[in-house]
Amino acid sequence: MTAPNIEMIASSLRNCSLNGGGGGGGGRRRGRRAAAAEGSDDSEGVTVELNSEVALPYHWEQCLDIRTGQVYYINWEDGTRTTIDPRSSSAYSPSPASRSASSSSRRCSRARGRGGGGGAAAAASTTTSSGYTSVSSVGAVTAAAAAWRSHDSSGHGYGYGYGYGSYGYGYGYDGRDGDDEESSSSSSSSSSSSSSASSSRGSAVSSTLSSFSPTDESASGAGSGYAVGDNGAHVLVAAGCRACFMYFMVPKTADVCPKCGSSGLLHLSRNGYV
């Protein structure tokens, strides 16, 4: 067996061929390079201008067709599709449908703003071009409601309050039931009895709170802002009423409910209730 020719093997390796065909592989490589160069020449001639430095309107969308390379725009308000850039002045003009929809929405907003309040509220309200009602109308409505409640003569109410140093407490009660028909059909005897009952409750509450009048010495005390006497008359404790089932902060010596005027309050600290 003869040894292989080393020089022939080396020359075949240099030509990337083992059959001695010399230069076949090099020709294929040159063909591939030429085809790639030709393809790059074709792609260099295609450019697409996106104008991304200018923002589109909020209801427009910019799309690109991959097959044709065409850029088109879709208006999501009416579903139209166009190749004209909506950022230009001629294409950005609103369509008649959008103009009519916006005008109708503004009319509805103005109607809601005018219909929401009557009387003084309508006179004080101001409607802007966007259809919103100013805050002054809300204040007028609140003032009108307060005036109506203050001038309503069908109900009765009472209130009380007391303060001590830097501490204070207040309570109010309105005896109206809110039914206009029932209040208008009530007899004179029921109104007189209710007024007498309310006056008796008011006198009981006044007599109870009169014992809790702060003195000049205690009001001018330092520290926490109140002073406690020897008998504990100026100490606030939690108490519950058996009649109206409510809890109040009342003086320790008080025994009358500040709401209904009934006696026998359950002082939590005195009777040991938890």
UniProtKB/Swiss-Prot annotation:
Tell me, what is an example of a GO biological process annotation in this record?
A: cuticle development
Matching entries from Gene3D superfamilies are given as:
2.20.70.10
- Positions of the region Disordered? 17-44, 83-133, 175-216
Q: Which residues form a coiled coil?
A: none
Q: Where is the composition biased (Low complexity)?
A: 87-106, 121-133, 184-207
Give the quaternary structure: Binds to HDG1.
Protein name as annotated:
Protein CURLY FLAG LEAF 1
According to its UniProt entry, this protein's organism is Oryza sativa subsp. japonica
